[in-house]
UniProtKB/Swiss-Prot annotation:
Belongs to the UPF0725 (EMB2204) family. It comes from the Eukaryota. This is UPF0725 protein At1g19060. PANTHER family: CYSTATIN/MONELLIN SUPERFAMILY PROTEIN, MALECTIN-LIKE DOMAIN-CONTAINING PROTEIN. Signal peptide: none annotated.
């Protein structure tokens, strides 16, 4: 066997892969249709979501990621880095008008180090601390639709293929409270805080796995961090108090309404024996 030939082939493959990712980095992962991936490389796949036959596997997720970019800078070209699965954990490093480039050096998301732990849900008395918390008024909820967006992102991050636009349209925010480390004057300035934690109580979306009907009030926490140096927006969120699989008998589970509903709709069933929540995340570029 000619080991020299094998070594040379491997070096050529590594060089081709490095060149491919160099070209992607130069384009910041936008307009990549003309960049061809070498054989065997892990490639980015472009989708034209305006075409009826684009067949993106998660169209609702694309819509919400685009909304996250619009929320960041109200612009049109968005790069979203999904850091983990099973909960909301994303960074939006780019949000700008489509076709516009900058001469600034792109700062990778890995350089934006943030804690991935959420705070505990505060006690009822703690919410009365006006120097830390601000209870969002009903009129302010209507004028700050990013709060609803955060909730939708959390639900989609956890349920992903099991949720639709029609499901999200049923959501009703019962109460939203914003916490900041520093006191802000006037208090509603917390709505614009670059670093904040949002506590949301909501209803309208049933969850058979925790025996929760549409009128059952559920809780979500979302932490927002905007880094002024890098321009990166970080969103971390999860549902609170919803341990999905605790002391479940297999016979009971596989005959449960939740499991049968997944099978009926040809969805991959969620179970404690098919745990797919551990992963490395993904990167989505949206034009």
């Amino acid at each position: 066997m000619d080991w020299t030939m094998i070594s040379g082939s491997r070096d050529e493959s590594l060089h081709a892969a490095r060149d491919y990712w160099r070209r992607l980095n130069e384009s910041e992962c936008f307009d990549i249709e003309g960049i061809e991936a070498p054989p065997g490389a892990i490639a980015l796949i472009p989708y034209d979501c305006q075409l009826p036959n684009s067949f993106h596997p998660l169209p609702l997720w694309v819509k919400l990621y685009a909304s996250a970019g619009l929320h960041r800078f109200n612009m049109l070209e968005v790069l979203v880095n999904e850091r983990s699965v099973g909960k909301l954990n994303i960074i939006v490093p780019i949000a700008r008008p489509k076709g516009v480039t900058t001469n600034e050096r792109f700062i990778p998301c890995d350089c934006f180090s943030v804690d991935d732990k959420l705070p505990q849900w505060p006690s009822h008395d703690s919410f009365n601390d006006r120097k830390r918390f601000y209870s969002v008024k009903e009129s302010e909820l209507q004028n700050n639709d990013w709060i609803n967006l955060y909730l939708e992102l959390v639900l989609c991050a956890i349920q992903k293929v099991r949720i639709s636009d029609s499901d999200l349209s049923k959501l009703k925010i019962v109460k939203a409270v914003i916490e900041t480390k520093e006191d802000m004057v006037p208090p509603n300035e917390r709505l614009n805080a670059k670093t904040a934690v949002v506590y949301i109580t909501f209803k309208g979306l049933a969850n058979a796995r925790i025996a929760a009907g549409e009128h059952y009030e559920r809780k979500a926490i979302i932490r927002r961090i905007f880094n002024e140096h890098t321009g990166h927006l970080s969103l971390l969120g999860d549902l609170i108090g919803e341990k999905k699989f605790v002391n479940i008998d297999p016979v009971t589970y596989f005959n449960s309404p939740a499991y049968l509903e997944d099978i009926t709709h040809e969805l991959p069933p969620e179970s404690p024996w098919m745990d797919i929540l551990a992963g490395t995340g993904s990167m989505d570029q949206i034009d």
